[in-house]
């Protein structure tokens, strides 16, 4: 079977603070059928966890819980956002129009940075200028409840995810306006770094929900607009269209 590659939007996922977990050195791993960035969705009383893919909208169901053993953190919970190699169950094949597949092997390639939207934006005291909201490899995308934001920043010290916050600002017709804010840094910072963070929409938070519910979808499509403070008083803006029902489906 011809291998399917990640869509171009997912190329070059390199972050100065991505926690990577790769295959053993010198071992190319199983002969995977495809590679995906996925969201790990917890199971219900009717079944175990499944993987929801970003690139093609596929759902991957493991044939046994042990298939996802490599996606567990030390506390036994599953990482929510990961890049993986996937081996389809024998007899399965990628078919046009088919969106659900059973998988026999899943290999962890990288753990993505992920966190919730900030719902206490009023407490964020500092805001430092970002270099850009996109890079040559990635633009923002939104799927399965996550807004995925690649960005470039400047710093004089080591930073982590907790130094960057995305929060909802307002609804404008079919658009949810958000802001990405860097709260740790220095005005004379000179080192440049790049990162990708998957921000989860907190639909269980009433303040966020009130803003989101004011967005008016057009045939289920909404726009997520990410803004940020840029250098030299420039306002950075990046937008993406996504499915309103898909974004709410996993909360």
What is the predicted function of each stretch?
Residues 131-194:
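Short helix-loop boundary/capping segments
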Residues 90, 153-157, 184, 205, ...:
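Beta-strand elements of well-folded, non-transmembrane domains
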Residues 230-251:
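Short beta-strand elements
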Residues 75-78, 186-229:
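Short, solvent-exposed, Trp/other aromatic-anchored flexible loops in extracytoplasmic proteins
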Residues 70-100, 223-226:
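Flexible glycine-rich surface loops and low-complexity tracts that mediate binding to linear polymers
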Residues 1-44:
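Bacterial Sec-dependent N-terminal signal peptides
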Residues 92-154:
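Surface-exposed beta-loop interaction hotspot
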Residues 55-75:
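Beta-strand/loop nucleic-acid-binding surfaces
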């Amino acid at each position: 079977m011809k291998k399917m590659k990640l869509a171009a939007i997912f190329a070059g996922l390199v972050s100065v603070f991505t926690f990577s977990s790769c295959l053993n050195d010198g071992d190319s791993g199983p002969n995977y059928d495809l590679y995906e960035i996925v969201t790990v969705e917890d199971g219900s009383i009717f079944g175990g966890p499944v993987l929801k893919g970003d690139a093609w909208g596929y759902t991957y169901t493991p044939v046994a819980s042990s298939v996802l053993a490599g996606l567990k953190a030390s506390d036994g919970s599953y990482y929510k956002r990961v890049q993986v190699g996937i081996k389809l169950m024998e007899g399965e094949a990628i078919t046009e129009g088919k969106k659900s597949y059973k998988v026999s092997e899943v290999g962890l390639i990288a753990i993505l940075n992920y966190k919730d939207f900030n719902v206490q934006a009023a407490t964020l005291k500092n805001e430092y200028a970002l270099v850009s909201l996109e890079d040559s490899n990635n633009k923002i995308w939104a799927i399965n409840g996550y807004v995925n934001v690649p960005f470039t920043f400047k710093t004089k010290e080591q930073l982590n995810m907790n130094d960057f916050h995305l929060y909802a600002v307002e609804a404008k017709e079919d658009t949810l306006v958000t802001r990405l804010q860097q709260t740790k840094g220095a005005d004379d910072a000179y080192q440049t770094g790049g990162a990708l963070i998957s921000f989860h929409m907190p639909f269980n938070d009433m303040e966020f929900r009130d803003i989101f519910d004011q967005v008016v979808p057009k045939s289920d499509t909404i726009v997520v607009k990410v803004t940020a403070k840029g250098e030299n008083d420039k306002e950075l803006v990046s937008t993406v269209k996504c499915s309103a029902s898909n974004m709410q489906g996993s909360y």
